[in-house]
Amino acid sequence: MASKSQFPYEDRARDHPNPLARRLFQIATEKQSNVVVSADVTTTKELLDLADRLGPYMVVLKTHIDILADFSAETITGLQSLSQKHNFLIFEDRKFVDIGNTVQKQYHGGALHISEWAHIVNATVLPGPGIIDALAQVASAPDFPHASDRGLLILATMTSKGSLATGQYTELSVELARKYKGFVLGFVASRSLEGVETAGKADDEDFVLFTTGVNLASKGDALGQQYQTPESAIGGGADFIISGRGIYAAPDPVDAARRYQKAGWDAYLKRVGR
């Protein structure tokens, strides 16, 4: 798979064919940050407080909205307001994994109304191509008002020990990203996918890579999570680094966010030769 990871964010913001990817790289350039905060908290108050305090230092806020015990319309209006205030995107880590008809309802309806507020969502290709097609249909529908501001990340690899997201699964992830590149921004992956070759490759493709499990202090947890540092993640091809407990569970989350911002940005500057 072709990679443009050696190019500066501002170049990718200028040249990227996907409008949401352009916006993502523009925000990163303006804020000098490639940090995605995974705010795995369980109340709306905690979530909005973190989003407000950490908003200046992150590019994307990643949510697991279904773990909130008190989710309501106020949760969403609060997130949208803070997204505008601090100029960050919202990534709902829903990991869609069902038949197409079901994921369309999960994405565009139900209790969560995800398509109305989440700029980015993700999915696994375990159900086959239909899941990506179904989500893309929602975003491209004539009556959908947010088409240019929505995108999908395909879960191509995982950081948990013993993950089966390898080999043919990863290859299918790349193949479907190429087929639906108007909607697919890129991947959630623990490493660069540059060596993955499939049909449909184009010289100008520029898929964005989000890497999870980034932690400055820990190498893992008791449940099989495996961490890497901002420097190793960016050096390995990540465009954006996702950190959860390393930031929000720190004694001073704001100080932690600043440290991750600096570490991630320094690693990016090193990668592009600045």
Swiss-Prot record:
Keywords: Decarboxylase, Lyase, Pyrimidine biosynthesis. One of its GO terms (molecular function) is orotidine-5'-phosphate decarboxylase activity. Substrate binds at residues 40, 62-64, 93-102, 227, 245. Pathway: Pyrimidine metabolism; UMP biosynthesis via de novo pathway; UMP from orotate: step 2/2. Transmembrane segments: none annotated. The active site is at residue 95. It catalyses: orotidine 5'-phosphate + H(+) = UMP + CO2. The keyword Zinc-finger does not apply. Its EC number is 4.1.1.23. One of its GO terms (cellular component) is cytosol. It is an enzyme of class 4 (lyase). It comes from the Eukaryota. GO terms for biological process: 'de novo' pyrimidine nucleobase biosynthetic process; 'de novo' UMP biosynthetic process. Belongs to the OMP decarboxylase family. PANTHER family: OROTIDINE 5'-PHOSPHATE DECARBOXYLASE (PTHR32119:SF2). This is Orotidine 5'-phosphate decarboxylase. It comes from Coccidioides posadasii (strain RMSCC 757 / Silveira).
